[in-house]
Amino acid sequence: AINILAEKYPEMKSNTGIAILGGHSEEIANQLALPTYPLGYINDESKIISIYNAVESFVLPSLEDNLPNTIMESMACGIPCVGFNVGGIPEMIDHQVNGYVARYKDSEDLATGIHWVLEASDYKQLSENAVHKVSIEYSQHNVAMSYIEVYNQAISTKK
């Protein structure tokens, strides 16, 4: 998707960089047409927060994922997200509300989503919506209440 993005929007080559987190970041960086910053695996929470606060979008090109913590973390920092319509990702990213949900395995749509978040959207509103979604749906209290509800339903069906 990054190479498609660079081809469709050549002006992004001069004002867009890609920070890559996780294993194999060096290997991936050498394959991309935009400037890259391979950061490797980071488990220091304060460094992760600093990285989220330094970027304008979080892209998760995963082809299978349930409820990725990385999306919650980035949205909590006000960072709009882009990901494929797979697993729990579309439950977390509200399409064109707090990010962009691309068609499954469609790299061109993923590139469109990245461009839309960075250039065509009301970025401030996306950012506010991301924080709001996380604070409402993924707060410790709400998650705990969801578990309690599941347990209560399980208990009531056994009676």
Where is each model-derived feature located?
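Short hydrophobic beta-strand element within catalytic cores of glycosyltransferases
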Residues: 80-83
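Nucleotide-activated donor-binding/catalytic signature segment of Leloir-type glycosyltransferases, i.e.
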Residues: 13-16, 22, 26-46
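Conserved acidic donor-binding segment of nucleotide-sugar-dependent glycosyltransferases
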Residues: 95-96, 100-107, 116-121
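Short acidic/histidine- and often glycine-rich active-site loop of Leloir-type glycosyltransferases
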Residues: 72, 86-96, 100-101
